Amino acid sequence: MSLSAKDYEPNWSSLDSRPTPQWYKDAKFGIFIHWGLYSVPAWGPKGSYAEWYLNGLKSGDSTRLKYHAENYGKDFPYRGFIDLFNPVDYEPEQWADLFKQSGAKYVVLTSKHHDGFCLWPSAESKGYNSVNGAAKRDLLGDL
């Protein structure tokens, strides 16, 4: 696979002019994984995404706020999930074997979602990452 740099303007016309890479067209099947602190509550109201748990709390979504208060306490901060996100049964080698057996040609892991929590020891995360949390490991690097 070769990558080439090209400048794009911050508008849809320019961004839409990007060609789809041939390898992506040929791959046909890949796996996308959303995994992070939002996996602790792993909950969202019907019709919403659990990955946007923090956004729901910040926006004042009454259903999400009620769920959060009932399950974690009204004053429990979202960042508190760093001490609860501890995937002790995470076996990245088994994941990789399963991906290969499935015929997937690529895997995309949300190594940092909208909440800013990193699944690797980023120097820019100010400690807000899996190595400094309960997991105590580089979840991205292990995969």
Language model feature labels by segment:
Residues S2-L143:
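Mature catalytic domains of secreted/periplasmic carbohydrate-active enzymes
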